[in-house]
Amino acid sequence: MRHVWVIGAATLLFATTAPAFEGTIKLRTTALTADQLAEGNGGKKLDDAAILAMTPEQLAKNDKAQVRESMVYVSGSKVRMDMPMESKGSGYAVVDLDKGLTWFVVPGEKRYIEWSETDAKAIGEKMAQMKKMMTERMASMPPDQRKQVEAMMKNMQMPDDEAAPQPTVAITPLNKTQTINGMSATGYKATEDENTVVAWVTNDQPELNKALLNVSERMEKLTPANMRKENVRRQLQQKGLPVMVQNLGGGRYRVEEIIAVEQKPVEATLFVVPQDYAKTTGRDALKNIPGPGGPPASAPAAAAPAKKP
């Protein structure tokens, strides 16, 4: 599910920085495990080359294939992405780049979460406080428990930590082109986190391609410098719009596609969160996390109601 949001968020965000583009983007993700692929092949295990040669249409013929579709709506600086939620029905995200705000909306529960740079900063500060508190308490811990906490803290990155060296991700041209969902695309191959990635990149959408790097820079501002990670998708964005990304690893094969891009007027109401929905923010989640001074207050001061997006 996370990967659907990743490709969707990347597409919807970079689209908004191009004022000339207004319309919709349709996404689809198709996934199967290696065992399910073998079952569909008469019990015979397929090698990586055979799996990567399978198209989404071929995968979808397997009755165990997980197929999910979602829509992205773009209008000026506002973007909305609809998508299914495994346990709560459908949900959507609204991004307003002019305001620097994102709203994650859950209609089934009539609530939404607001996220901003202020929330990201507050969470980073809280993480630093927690790390300091754990460091102070380690001195009184039994040796075994102290080792466990030390190991956990070693993997925790804080806003004031130095950035860890980033491994170089090599992207190799396949020297192949094909038409995918009506768009001419060039193939590339890479390895990331022990996964094989084959991506097909198009330049048929110039407005979207031009906006890609601008949005990447905006998104980086929401992440502390030491926590930013160079990845295959970021490098692919330098080459154009990834119209299809095949990912094989961990016993799973997943294909993410942009199956349609349509330029047309979009209703303004799609970007409005209902007034009667309950609001929470990223900072609200911090109220129940104890700080260095002890447990959180039992009755925090009420905040003034914020304006709806």
Annotate each PLM feature:
Residues 1-4:
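Positively charged n-region of N-terminal signal peptides that target proteins for export
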Residues 11-12:
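Repetitive helical segments and hydrophobic/amphipathic motifs
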Residues 15-17:
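N-terminal signal peptide c-region/cleavage motif recognized by signal peptidases
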Residues 19-309:
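Extended soluble regions of mature proteins
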